[in-house]
């Protein structure tokens, strides 16, 4: 058995094009966030690393607008955070209602059925959101222990109404799990005020960070559910009973109490090697958020979206979601992601290719039921600014004219 050069690929230094990423994610990295990817590597038991962990958890509480002690980053993309919620909160015999009105709310359902519960899918046409009456009807009829929904649906650009949903879940003794991957950091989210029990996001969208690490928060009620399961969490890597021992060993998941001892004296229990430089970059993204102020960040995303709507109208284009509804708790357009109807007779793929080839601008097409019907334009994180929108509208005008659309 000899040494082989069969797969010894001859390569040069990696050189990637510089794109303006105005699709559904990722967004462009903020330079300060990017710089943290080459910060010094330290061991995962180093005191300086523990300090980064603690600061990041506190900054995430600001992001989520929560006092939840169990607020940690998951090692993995947003889908890993989704599966953390599903695998920890569902066990055999549990009845779960999944509200499905888009690609990613359906992904939650597809994931949930693998964990042995009685999973009930409540469908609504893509591009719509669930009214409070519909949600209450599902809770009354099915009596679930968990309700899942997506607040900002990446596939449709729809913002789900949140007003009153948490109160209904408490009324019917049901935990509430909310996907905020395309929304958190771009539009207002109030985990505590909205009585959300499990919430998560990704770093690569409205935080302008690299993918691969995902903020997550659990209420004390969710933690109690996890700690008092009748069966072990079926996913060892994402088991929050184990993850808590590393991130927050001072916290008792079962009763929500915090140990009285000095935190530094409570040993962390190793679980897995966390992606250190991704954690540094997440921390820096959150520091930037604090420096600008959440209210200012939200307003910047809203102002950018409204400027985009005006630009689209000037080209004769229409957002797919007609309702604006600026109040954060109301259903309507998601300011961080806009779906745009592709005009009749226009080749949507050719327009996207023209933007990419001639202007290095990336927007995306629809997925699932919306494939070939819409473009998806993301104004996320640092990319939500007037200069990018003016450049996009000007470039899009050229792309449309080349493809025979009179604008």
Curated annotation (Swiss-Prot):
The keyword Transferase applies. One of its GO terms (cellular component) is peroxisome. The gene is agxt. Substrate binds at residue 376. It comes from Dictyostelium discoideum. The keyword Heme does not apply. CDD domains: AGAT_like. Its EC number is 2.6.1.51, 2.6.1.44. Keywords: Aminotransferase, Pyridoxal phosphate, Transferase. It catalyses: L-serine + pyruvate = 3-hydroxypyruvate + L-alanine; glyoxylate + L-alanine = glycine + pyruvate. Its cofactor is pyridoxal 5'-phosphate. GO terms for biological process: glycine biosynthetic process, by transamination of glyoxylate; glyoxylate metabolic process. InterPro entries: Aminotrans_V_dom, PyrdxlP-dep_Trfase, PyrdxlP-dep_Trfase_major, PyrdxlP-dep_Trfase_small, SP_NH2Trfase/AEP_transaminase. It holds the Pfam family Aminotran_5. One of its GO terms (molecular function) is alanine-glyoxylate transaminase activity. Belongs to the class-V pyridoxal-phosphate-dependent aminotransferase family. Gene3D superfamilies: Aspartate Aminotransferase, domain 1, Type I PLP-dependent aspartate aminotransferase-like (Major domain). The modification N6-(pyridoxal phosphate)lysine is found at residue 205. Dual metabolic roles of gluconeogenesis and glyoxylate detoxification. This is Serine--pyruvate aminotransferase. SUPFAM superfamilies: PLP-dependent transferases (SSF53383).
């Amino acid at each position: 058995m000899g040494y082989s050069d069969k797969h010894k690929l001859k390569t040069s230094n990696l050189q990637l094009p510089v794109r303006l990423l105005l699709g559904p994610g990722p967004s462009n990295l903020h330079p300060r966030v990017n710089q943290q990817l080459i910060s010094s590597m330290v061991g995962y038991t180093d005191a300086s690393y523990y300090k980064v962990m603690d600061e990041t958890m506190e900054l995430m509480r600001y992001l989520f607008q929560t006092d939840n002690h169990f607020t940690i980053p998951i090692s993995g993309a947003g889908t890993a955070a989704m599966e953390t919620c599903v695998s920890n909160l569902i066990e055999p015999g549990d009845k779960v209602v999944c509200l499905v009105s888009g690609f990613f709310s359906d992904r939650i359902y597809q994931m949930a059925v693998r964990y042995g519960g009685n999973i009930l899918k409540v469908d609504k046409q893509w591009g719509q959101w669930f009214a409070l009456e519909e949600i209450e009807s599902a809770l009354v009829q099915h009596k679930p222990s968990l309700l899942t929904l997506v607040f900002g649906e990446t596939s449709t650009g729809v913002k789900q109404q949140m007003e009153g949903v948490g109160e209904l879940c408490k009324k019917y003794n049901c935990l509430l799990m909310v996907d905020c991957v395309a929304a958190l950091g771009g539009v207002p989210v109030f985990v505590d005020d909205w009585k959300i029990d499990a919430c998560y996001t990704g770093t690569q969208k409205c935080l302008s960070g690299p993918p691969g690490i995902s903020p997550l928060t659990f209420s004390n009620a969710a933690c109690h559910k996890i700690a008092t399961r009748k069966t072990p969490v079926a996913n060892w890597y994402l088991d929050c009973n184990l993850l808590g021992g590393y991130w927050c060993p001072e916290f008792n998941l079962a009763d929500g109490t915090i140990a009285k001892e000095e935190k530094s004296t409570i040993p962390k229990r190793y679980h897995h090697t966390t992606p250190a430089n991704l954690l540094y970059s997440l921390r820096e993204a959150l520091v930037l958020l604090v420096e600008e102020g959440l209210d200012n960040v939200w307003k910047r995303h809203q102002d950018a979206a409204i400027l985009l709507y005006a630009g689209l109208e000037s080209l004769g284009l229409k957002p797919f979601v007609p309702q604006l509804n600026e109040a954060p708790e109301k259903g309507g357009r998601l300011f961080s992601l806009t779906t745009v109807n592709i005009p009749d007779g226009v080749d949507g793929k050719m327009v996207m290719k023209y933007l990419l080839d001639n202007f290095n601008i990336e927007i995306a097409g629809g997925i699932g039921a919306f494939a070939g019907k819409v473009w998806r334009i993301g104004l996320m994180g640092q990319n939500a600014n007037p200069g990018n929108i003016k450049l996009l509208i000007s470039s899009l005008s050229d792309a449309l004219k080349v493809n025979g659309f009179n604008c």
